[in-house]
């Protein structure tokens, strides 16, 4: 029953999965994994108190179940019990120091509070170290587009005279691999994975497992453009018909320069996505005093918009320059979404494209994360039925796009120069949390 529940959940049949887990527990009340899976299902359904009870039962049955402590922490944070959530994350890390999700969740608490930059950055970097420490190749292979990015970055670091353990051997081996005729021909095949032999693995791993993060310079004052009247910007957004606007010259020149260098130099781009782009996240190394100060500036200078809402998280996406399509249509579980671009316009081959398409109809409150993010056909059908307008914001260097996070959005087609510094990079900040409705909360 538990195994069937897992399969049904993967197929999106959440209610049927829940029934399977409950049946398994009725047969064996001490079935640890069934209690845990039931808790995860309740959380997806927005029934947080029931999820909390499930995780507490798992811990009662096995106090050393690190994932259960971590998952309980997630629920407690959503319920506003921050100190108890911290204790859960700490317990999970104590049991399993390499539990990446517990470390990232712990870091995110300090990030969202915006009161202790040093601890927030330290905890985030600890999470990145866990990733690098445990880095390994899946089935002795690497995605071709990821290797292409990593060698471009390694060459950039070499050109800037950064000395990183294993970098020369990495460049030599990666060059040989990408130079093979079959890989040259398939360079734009985002799904291709390259099978590696043991010698290649041993040559690539030391560099890939090494941490390296750019230390941004100290900036006094605001990191967002001090010449703008931000209260006017705020009023314009609040009075807009559809809660979508763009803001040019968003960051100060100094902050923009430092964020760009951070994104080019830092080895933080670990999350692979199908459309040939890489993600880096605030709770796992994509963080600096400037990143955090931007959030504070937004809360202070646009107090009606951002003041009431906690920073959720922020991240960066870095795209393959030859990418045709960007991020698939999706919405975010937040109140406000701020997206800004930091690759100079000279690298964009199509000045009318490369930006963001936003649809001005919010996602239904009762949709789950999978509805928001995975089922593209269902989303487009919903948008058509609700006569959604598509607002297409073209790409521009240092342009920010501010919109209601419940709006579905997707990256426009991308055609940037095929070189490392030409890769399109965007930063996204989420404020507030839009929870699935539940009769229990």
Listing of model-derived features with the role each one plays in the protein:
Residues 2-10, 33-44, 67-78, 101-108:
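Conserved alpha-helical positions within TPR/SEL1-like repeat arrays
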Residues 112, 117-400, 406-441:
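Fe(II)/2-oxoglutarate oxygenase catalytic core
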Residues 12, 46, 80, 114-115:
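Residue-level detector of the short coil/turn that links helix A to helix B
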């Amino acid at each position: 029953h538990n195994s069937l529940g897992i399969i049904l959940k993967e197929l999106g049949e959440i209610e049927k999965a829940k029934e399977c887990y409950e049946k398994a527990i009725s047969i064996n009340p001490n079935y640890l994994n069934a209690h845990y899976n039931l808790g995860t299902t309740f959380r997806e359904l927005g029934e947080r108190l029931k999820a909390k009870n499930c995780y507490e039962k798992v811990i009662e049955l096995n106090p050393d179940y690190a994932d259960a402590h971590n998952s309980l922490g997630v629920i407690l944070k959503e319920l506003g019990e921050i100190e108890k959530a911290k204790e859960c994350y700490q317990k999970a890390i104590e049991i399993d120091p390499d539990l990446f999700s517990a470390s990232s969740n712990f870091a995110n608490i300090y990030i969202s509070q915006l009161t202790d930059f040093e601890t927030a950055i330290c905890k985030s970097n600890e999470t990145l170290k866990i990733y690098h420490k445990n880095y390994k190749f899946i089935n002795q292979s690497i995605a071709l587009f990821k290797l292409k990015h990593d060698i471009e970055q390694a060459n950039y670091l070499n050109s800037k005279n950064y000395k990183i353990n294993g970098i020369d051997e990495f460049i030599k081996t990666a060059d040989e691999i990408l130079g093979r005729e079959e890989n040259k021909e398939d360079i734009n095949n985002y799904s291709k994975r390259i099978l590696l032999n043991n010698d290649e693995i041993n040559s690539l791993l030391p560099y890939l497992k090494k941490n390296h993060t750019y230390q941004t310079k100290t900036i006094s004052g605001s990191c967002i453009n001090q010449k703008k009247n931000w209260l006017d910007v705020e009023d314009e957004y609040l009075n807009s018909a559809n809660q979508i606007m763009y803001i040019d010259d968003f960051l100060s020149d100094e902050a923009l320069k430092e964020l760009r260098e951070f994104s080019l130099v830092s080895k933080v781009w670990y999350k692979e996505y199908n459309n040939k782009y890489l993600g880096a996240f605030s709770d796992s190394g994509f963080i600096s005093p400037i990143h955090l100060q931007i959030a504070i500036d937004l809360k202070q200078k646009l107090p009606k918009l951002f003041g009431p809402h906690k920073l959720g998280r922020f991240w960066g996406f870095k795209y393959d320059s030859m990418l045709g399509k960007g991020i698939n249509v999706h919405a975010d579980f937040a109140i406000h979404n701020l997206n800004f671009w930091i690759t100079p316009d000279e690298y964009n081959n199509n000045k009318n494209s490369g930006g963001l398409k936003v649809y001005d109809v919010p996602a239904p409150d009762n949709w789950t994360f999978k509805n928001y993010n995975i089922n593209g056909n269902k989303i487009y059908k919903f948008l058509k039925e609700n006569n959604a307008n598509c607002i297409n914001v073209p790409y521009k260097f240092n342009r920010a796009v501010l919109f209601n996070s419940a709006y579905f959005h997707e990256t426009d087609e991308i055609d940037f120069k095929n070189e490392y510094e030409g890769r399109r990079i965007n930063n996204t900040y989420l404020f507030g949390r839009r929870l699935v409705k539940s009769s229990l909360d």
